Amino acid sequence: MSAKEAVAKRILELCEERNMAINALASSAGVSPSTIYSMLNSKSQNPGIVSIKKLCDGLDISIRQFFDSNLFDDLEQEIK
């Protein structure tokens, strides 16, 4: 799994745990829904750490908690 796929899956996982819609997350994180949807649909080549931090703020979690998931354990090599 690529890093961007893992980020997308983690966002969906966290929203599902909190019964939170993407639009609600966007509102609480201060980003547009299209920003999140582009991260989820792999249109964003590199979801930036600032965007991820805003989502973490909207989810009321730390960056460490965001990346504390088995999804990030065996990521494929990004340098080809």
Where on the chain are the PLM-derived regions?
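Residues in the recognition helix of alpha-helical DNA-binding motifs
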Residues: 14, 28, 39, 69
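Short, basic-rich loop-to-helix N-cap that marks the start of a DNA-contacting helix
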Residues: 43-57
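A short, Lys/Arg-rich alpha-helix, primarily the initiator
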Residues: 1-21
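Recognition helix of helix-turn-helix/homeodomain-like DNA-binding domains
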Residues: 30-46
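Short, charged recognition helix plus adjacent turn
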Residues: 38, 67-80
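The alpha-helix within a helix-turn-helix
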Residues: 15, 26, 56
